[in-house]
Amino acid sequence: MAKRRALGLLLCLLLLLCTACGGQTQDDAGALHCTVKITCSTVLEHMDDLKPGKADIVPADGVLLPETTVAFSEGDTVFDVLQRVCRAQGIHMESTWTPAYNSAYIEGIGNLYEFDCGELSGWMYSVNGVWPDYGCSGYTLRDGDTVVWSYTCDLGRDVGARQGEP
């Protein structure tokens, strides 16, 4: 009888622990979610154009952050989520505010900066496969969005961006 009672108590404790340690945290409860990926794979095809000393920071597969699910709040922008995910993952990110565009401009991610791979290189973002023609601070995310930050070596042509085209 004592063994049965101990087993029952153990099962109750296990159930309590599983409930307390579920998939969502207090901070995550009721949050919206998107996925974020950061890639610089185009650099792999342009290593000769890369500034000296930068080759060591480019991952072998060109992926700085694999597709990662991120919780966000109503009203958060692509920039807000980029800041949060980079901080959480220990990825260096540098930006500056650009008044002309009323948005943050991403200068560098993972120590890979604009112009590190030629005059037409820098960071661009897409959401759900679309390349917005405005800054990342101006794009308010929706639940389920997929954000990809891509390093371009050719003003977006090498990553599939069709900026300025109908």
Give residue spans per PLM region.
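Ubiquitin-like/PB1-type beta-grasp interaction modules and other compact soluble beta-rich domains
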Residues: 2-8, 12, 16-166
